[in-house]
């Protein structure tokens, strides 16, 4: 909340105070959009999470400004439609790319639909300055609670430290739940914690290796958690409850990471089964790593994603389907907005950005099911517009509006927990910004445009598209199947490269989690849309069982050098069930 309060409001104040109101408004909008992407995590990861969408937004603003200045309505609509196709395809690559696609289109809508005297490059620089200001605050300010304990004088890595500690806590929670009803949910929580820590540690860097002792220590502590997570997953697969004492070691390691202290005494080993022996061995190795981590040069396994993967995702079935839908929504909304502009729906001013910008956020499937997005957007906009209409009649100008922008900026991080609340806060903030920039009070027309955008996106969302519906979900399932097969081949090949095995296991579980998220969103759609992905949840469950069994095989092979009949039987059962669902994951000859 502190970063939000110090972002948009002060930028707008600086612009108004220096007589550069229009650049101040753009900078504040950029800071607001960056604030929506500001999530808990490491400072290093925030550089990519905030910086890449900011660059895309500046590029969209640049393109939209020059296109709006030089093109008539029809060619401008075609250009914006092509941008929608590009941004939609890019959004299929991943979360950061999805945010970049959103910012690209919002920037283009503002550039074309909010004409200004400044040139395109001047507006783009103002946008970058606003997003850069929030990024600077993100890098410079400590997060709440980071100034306590032994790490209070070095809060640079508080996000990484919290993420790694959560991994050890998740391992302990899984061990507590083994053999119980909550075990599956705890295993999924462990995957999420490992994913979050991997992202926190793998942000952009100038040097190949960690430069400080504190960062090297965190890298080593994360790597030490991987065999612990592997052993805990093997125990989960076995399904037999373990003693309460088994979870004490990971909990003490979590406390040591969080407080940046030593591990202290660990519980005595309990070596009655191969998976328990693996857990005890991993715990002892982790304790040794904690003692000498500053001198270690271990790198966490990184995701093997390159430009070719991004291109395949953007041009694949999911990228094509999403790109066409975004292009149709964005192009149609821009055409309707320009038609309304020429009929003086907006009055005497030249701003028609609201309708296409609203359509961009509504067409994003990663913000929830379509019907839910539409209802939340409509309710949030109505509430926000009505609140702003009341406040605008009471607050002095421009001081009151600037204060309102600062308050809304502080509320954005809290409001991100619910799309309707976020919509209401952003509506008040944007209306205050553009009124400060000279646009008249337009709450009623904004409500009308939002409802029109909701209807448009609902219609387009149910239109048939070329190719198979649900392509994005099936593409993620196919990726998860390929990752599971690569992991299975490595384990049954009995390679001694554990780092490679851990990297493959991480990729298998991570792609499965991504597929699960996409399946859950698709299942929550209205029946007309949800039916296109029916049965995919069953495939994901079987793939998870296959990866869990592969992990149990890896641990058992390490301890005994051979598989039990139960391991082989479970592998064959999972592979046969996948075959029935049309997913082919061949069993290696080694089995």
Question: Where are the language model's segments positioned?
Answer:
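Alpha-helical transmembrane segments and their membrane-interface boundaries
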Residues: 1-104, 108-135, 266-410, 414-424, ...
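Cytochrome P450 heme-binding "Cys pocket" and the immediately downstream C-terminal segment
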Residues: 458-459
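A short glycine-rich beta-alpha junction/loop motif
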Residues: 453-455
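Cytosolic regulatory and coupling regions of membrane transport/channel systems
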Residues: 1-9, 13, 124, 134-349, ...
């Amino acid at each position: 909340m502190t970063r939000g309060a110090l972002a948009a409001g002060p930028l707008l104040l600086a612009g108004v105070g220096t007589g550069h109101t229009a650049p101040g408004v753009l900078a504040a909008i950029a800071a607001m959009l960056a604030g929506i992407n500001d999530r808990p995590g490491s400072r290093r990861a925030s550089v990519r999470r905030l910086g890449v969408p900011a660059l895309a937004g500046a590029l969209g603003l640049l393109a939209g400004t020059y296109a709006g200045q030089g093109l008539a309505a029809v060619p401008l609509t075609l250009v914006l439609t092509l941008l929608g196709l590009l941004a939609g395809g890019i959004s299929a690559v991943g979360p950061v790319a999805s945010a970049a696609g959103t910012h690209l289109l919002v920037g283009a809508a503002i550039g074309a639909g909010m004409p200004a005297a400044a040139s395109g490059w001047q507006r783009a620089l103002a946008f970058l300055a606003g997003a850069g200001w929030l990024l600077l605050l993100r890098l410079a300010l400590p997060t709440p609670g980071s100034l306590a304990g032994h790490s209070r004088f070095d809060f640079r890595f508080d996000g990484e430290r919290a993420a790694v500690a959560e991994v050890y806590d998740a391992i302990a929670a899984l061990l507590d739940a083994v053999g119980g009803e909550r075990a599956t949910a705890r295993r999924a929580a462990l995957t999420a914690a490992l994913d979050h820590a991997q992202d926190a540690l793998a942000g952009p860097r100038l040097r190949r290796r960690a430069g400080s002792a504190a960062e090297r220590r965190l890298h080593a502590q994360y790597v030490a958690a991987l065999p612990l997570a592997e052993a805990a997953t093997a125990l989960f697969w076995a399904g037999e409850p373990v003693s309460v004492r088994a979870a004490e070691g990971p909990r003490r390691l979590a406390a040591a990471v969080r407080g940046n202290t030593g591990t202290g005494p660990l519980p005595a080993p309990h070596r009655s089964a191969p998976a328990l022996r693996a857990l005890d061995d991993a715990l002892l190795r982790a304790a040794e790593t904690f003692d000498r981590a500053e001198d270690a040069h271990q790198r966490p396994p990184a995701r093997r994603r390159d430009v070719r993967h991004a291109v395949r995702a953007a041009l694949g079935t999911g990228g094509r389907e999403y790109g066409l839908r975004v292009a149709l929504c964005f192009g149609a909304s821009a055409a309707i907005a320009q038609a309304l502009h020429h009929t003086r729906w907006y009055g005497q001013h030249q701003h028609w950005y609201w309708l296409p910008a609203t359509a961009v956020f509504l067409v994003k499937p990663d913000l929830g099911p379509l019907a839910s997005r539409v209802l939340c957007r409509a309710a949030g906009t109505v509430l926000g517009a009505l609140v702003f209409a009341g406040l605008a009649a009471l607050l002095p100008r421009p001081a009151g509006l600037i204060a309102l922008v600062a308050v809304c900026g502080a509320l954005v991080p809290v409001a991100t927990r619910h799309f309707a609340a976020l919509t209401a806060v952003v509506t008040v903030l944007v209306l205050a910004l553009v009124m400060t920039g000279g646009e008249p009070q337009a709450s009623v027309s904004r409500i009308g445009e939002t409802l029109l955008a909701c209807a448009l996106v609902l219609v387009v969302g149910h239109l048939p598209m070329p190719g198979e519906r649900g392509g994005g979900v099936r593409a993620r399932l196919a990726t998860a199947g390929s990752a599971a097969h690569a992991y299975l081949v490595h384990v049954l090949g009995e390679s001694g490269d554990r780092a490679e095995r851990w990297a493959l296991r991480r990729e298998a579980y991570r792609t499965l989690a991504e597929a699960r998220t996409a399946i859950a969103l698709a299942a929550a759609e209205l029946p007309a849309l949800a039916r296109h992905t029916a049965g995919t949840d069953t495939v994901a469950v079987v793939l998870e069982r296959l990866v869990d069994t592969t992990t149990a095989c890896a641990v058992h092979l390490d301890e005994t050098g051979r598989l039990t009949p139960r391991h082989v039987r479970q592998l064959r059962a999972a592979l046969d069930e996948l075959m029935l669902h049309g997913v082919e994951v061949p069993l290696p000859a080694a089995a």
